[in-house]
Regions:
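Bacterial Sec-dependent N-terminal signal peptides
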Residues: 1-10
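Soluble, non-transmembrane alpha-helical interaction regions
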Residues: 9, 25, 30, 107-109
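Basic helix-turn-helix/winged-helix DNA-binding cores
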Residues: 9, 13-16, 23
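Amphipathic, charged alpha-helical segments and their helix-to-coil junctions
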Residues: 13, 34, 42, 87-129
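Amphipathic alpha-helical segments
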Residues: 18-100
Length: 129
């Protein structure tokens, strides 16, 4: 558990925080908001699946680190492939929002998607001090 919370609860809190931040920063009207979060939720399932597959590949690598070079190389390659697949579905979610948002909103959204994780890590680090 991270900082005394179970991982599922932390994910839910992060999702809620992200949703609030997106609404505030993007200043969407009601119609945009409905379309945006509907598409966002659709893509969340693909991202969740890709994350699970990446986690499984990492676990397999971790458990098999003492295997021979060929098996180890194969496991490492699988991790790389799953990581790329995850990044692709995240990019697809970002691209899916282009025709829902104005150009300015879309630019802000892209920045938010790429900076959010860093901002959350910094906030957690500062909270620990």
């Amino acid at each position: 558990m991270l900082y005394g919370q179970n991982p599922e609860k932390m994910r839910e809190r992060l999702k809620a925080y992200k949703k609030i931040m997106l609404m505030e920063k993007l200043n969407m009207n009601e119609e945009q908001s409905i379309k945006f979060f509907s598409r966002y939720a659709e893509h969340e399932e693909f991202i969740k699946k890709a994350k699970i597959e990446l986690d499984q590949a990492v676990d397999m690598l971790e458990q098999g680190v003492v295997l021979g070079k060929a098996e180890n190389d194969k496991a490492i390659q699988l991790v790389f492939e799953k990581d790329i697949a995850l990044k692709k579905v995240i990019i697809e979610r970002i691209k899916a929002m282009k025709n829902v948002l104005s150009e300015k909103q879309y630019g802000k959204y892209v920045v938010i998607e790429y900076k959010l994780l860093d901002d959350v890590k910094k906030a957690i680090k500062n909270r620990r001090k």
